[in-house]
Amino acid sequence: MARLIDQFQRLPGIGPRTAQRLALHLLNQPEDQVQQFADALLAARSQVGQCQSCFHLSADPLCEICSKPERNNGLICVVADSRDLLALERTREFKGQYHVLGGLISPMDGIGPELLHIKPLIERIAKDGISEVILALTPSVEGDTTSLYLARLMKPFCPVSRIAYGLPMGSELEYADEVTLSRALEGRRPMD
């Protein structure tokens, strides 16, 4: 059981107590249900790869988003990973295409630009006549580093913008840190 708990703890966001709860739950299930779970996990791992265009997860050569003709092919939103892409898709606001970098530049972790899907992004922008690139990367040192690096590479090809950062809905100003408040002020927009 300890081995199973250890494996669950390796998943993002799963601590020791949740890992133990998941392990106990699985061990209390009928064997056929556990087998179905294991089969689904192995099938997903072997059948799901990356979209050839945007590097989002996909079981087909092109993901569901890239294969939709109604999407705006002249607009690309750059994200670090598929979780960020899915978060943006939940808003139903963005109607363009995406590009998943596969991480952020982080020299401290040994992740340089060559380890990310940056070269295919630049090739895609140069080849496809992109009208704008939106950078939707996390507001962190790594996100800022990656954004500055990408903006410098892409500016000769098309306009580059970055999503606004600021305060989450329902938050109190007094509890926000200085960087968040500064970004919120910088990203202000006129009232409609």
UniProtKB/Swiss-Prot annotation:
Pfam families: RecR_C, RecR_HhH, RecR_ZnF, Toprim_4. Residues 74-168 form the Toprim domain. The keyword Zinc applies. InterPro entries: DNA_Rcmb_RecR (IPR000093), Rcmb_RecR (IPR023627), Rcmb_RecR_Znf (IPR015967), TOPRIM_dom (IPR006171), TOPRIM_RecR (IPR034137). SUPFAM superfamilies: Recombination protein RecR (SSF111304). Gene3D superfamilies: 3.40.1360.10, 6.10.250.240, RecR Domain 1 (1.10.8.420). Signal peptide: none annotated. The keyword DNA-binding does not apply. One of its GO terms (molecular function) is zinc ion binding. Keywords: DNA damage, DNA recombination, DNA repair, Metal-binding, Zinc, Zinc-finger. One of its GO terms (biological process) is DNA repair. A zinc finger (C4-type) spans 51-66. PANTHER family: RECOMBINATION PROTEIN RECR. May play a role in DNA repair. It seems to be involved in an RecBC-independent recombinational process of DNA repair. It may act with RecF and RecO. Belongs to the RecR family. NCBIfam families: recR. This is Recombination protein RecR. It comes from Synechococcus sp. (strain CC9902).
